[in-house]
Amino acid sequence: MRVIIQRVSQASVTVEGQKTADIQKGLLVLVGIEDADTQEDIDWLTGKIIKMRIFGDENDVMNCSVQDVDGDIIVVSQFTLHASTKKGNRPSYIKAAKPDFAIPMYENFVKSLEKEFGKKIQTGIFGADMKVNLLNDGPVTIVMDSKNRE
């Protein structure tokens, strides 16, 4: 499971002209799921995302988590995070999980985040053509892969 975590001052998701998510200070999390992903991957990423100290404290030192600053989270599914660009110029998405596996994993990921966070997680719509608007704060952008835990 791969995620891109972006610290934002504002973010929203629009599908077919309707806003499905809208936050101010918080995190925008893009998530890509592959067939080898398990609940263990979800649990590891959930703990990291909720506790990651990437918000400034009173001295503007990154010592605070999204919980500490009473921020919000938007999660957006993005199969293109598993693109392979090794061969040719057209990315291959063969490593991305098919919807029958990816949708339940995505839903479990969101539920796990909500449980750990103690707040509702806003989302896009899985598989939809989404317009994601964000104001990246910093910028602070973190890439994590549960299969390559660094």
From Swiss-Prot:
InterPro entries (alphabetical): Daa-tRNA_deacyls_DTD (IPR003732), DTD-like_sf (IPR023509)
Predominant location: cytoplasm
S-adenosyl-L-methionine in keyword set: no
One MF term in the entry's GO annotations: Gly-tRNA(Ala) deacylase activity
EC number(s) reported in the record: 3.1.1.96
Record motif Gly-cisPro motif, important for rejection of L-amino acids, residues: 138-139
Domain of life: Bacteria
Keyword Transferase: no
Compartment(s) of residence: Cytoplasm
Reactions the enzyme catalyzes: glycyl-tRNA(Ala) + H2O = tRNA(Ala) + glycine + H(+); a D-aminoacyl-tRNA + H2O = a tRNA + a D-alpha-amino acid + H(+)
NCBIfam families: D-aminoacyl-tRNA deacylase
Quaternary organization: Homodimer.
Description of its domains: A Gly-cisPro motif from one monomer fits into the active site of the other monomer to allow specific chiral rejection of L-amino acids.
Task performed by this protein: An aminoacyl-tRNA editing enzyme that deacylates mischarged D-aminoacyl-tRNAs. Also deacylates mischarged glycyl-tRNA(Ala), protecting cells against glycine mischarging by AlaRS. Acts via tRNA-based rather than protein-based catalysis; rejects L-amino acids rather than detecting D-amino acids in the active site. By recycling D-aminoacyl-tRNA to D-amino acids and free tRNA molecules, this enzyme counteracts the toxicity associated with the formation of D-aminoacyl-tRNA entities in vivo and helps enforce protein L-homochirality.
Family as reported in the entry's similarity comment: Belongs to the DTD family.
UniProt-recorded name of the protein: D-aminoacyl-tRNA deacylase
Organism encoding this protein: Flavobacterium johnsoniae (strain ATCC 17061 / DSM 2064 / JCM 8514 / BCRC 14874 / CCUG 350202 / NBRC 14942 / NCIMB 11054 / UW101)
